[in-house]
A protein has these predicted regions:
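Short gly/pro-enriched beta-turn/loop segments at secondary-structure junctions
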Residues: 4-5, 13-16, 72-77, 93
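Glycine-rich, charged/polar anion/phosphate-binding loops
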Residues: 4-8, 66-68
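C-terminal amphipathic alpha-helical segment
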Residues: 27-87, 91-92
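Conserved active-site loop/cleft motifs that coordinate metal ions or position small ligands
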Residues: 95-101, 115-121, 134-138
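Conserved beta-strand segments that form the floor/walls of ligand-binding pockets within enzyme
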Residues: 3, 20, 99
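Short acidic-glycine-tyrosine-enriched beta hairpin
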Residues: 1-3, 106-127
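Ligand-binding loop in jelly-roll beta-barrel domains
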Residues: 6-27, 122-144
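Glycine- and acidic-residue-biased ligand/ion/polar-headgroup-sensing regions
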Residues: 84-110, 114
Length: 145
């Protein structure tokens, strides 16, 4: 598990497979974009000045193991790595995202396979046939207080 707080410069290499949890914002400031293009073939806009203004160079990126059964709580979200079976309940007041890491979940006539995600609404409880290894991400509403 690698936690990269906002304001930290970062990049992904070609072929990287990541499970990214983003904050509830549509703001992205780009220093460089490898000449990528949008859906119209136009190079995506860079935001060098604004990126420098919001950069937090003293922040530390943390890297830890994230083994089965572990839970990590941060200001922005909680993330759990577990095996789900029988029932799955979201006790939070916000929706959670359940992503299947290994295995297959069957629920209410739907199937969710490895690499797929479902949205579990606040206080929703679903019945599950089978079991699967999953990551459950729940955002925290930290900006309203």
């Amino acid at each position: 598990l690698i936690y990269i707080p906002s304001g930290t410069i970062h990049a992904l290499t070609k072929g990287a497979l990541v499970y990214e949890i983003q904050q509830a914002t549509d703001i992205t400031y780009r220093f460089y974009d490898y000449d990528r293009t949008d859906e119209f073939g136009k190079k995506r806009q860079l935001h060098v000045k604004r990126a420098v203004e919001t950069l937090q160079p003293m922040q530390k990126v943390t890297k830890t193991t994230f083994k089965l059964g572990e839970e990590v709580q941060l200001r922005e979200f909680t993330i759990k790595h577990l095996v789900v079976e029988q029932t799955l309940k979201n006790s939070a007041d916000v929706a959670s995202v359940v992503t299947i890491v290994n295995g297959v979940l069957k629920m209410a006539g739907s199937v969710c396979q490895s690499g797929q995600s479902i949205l579990l609404l606040p206080h929703e409880c679903i019945s599950i046939i089978g079991k699967a290894e999953a990551i459950i991400a729940t955002p925290h509403i930290y900006w309203s207080s």
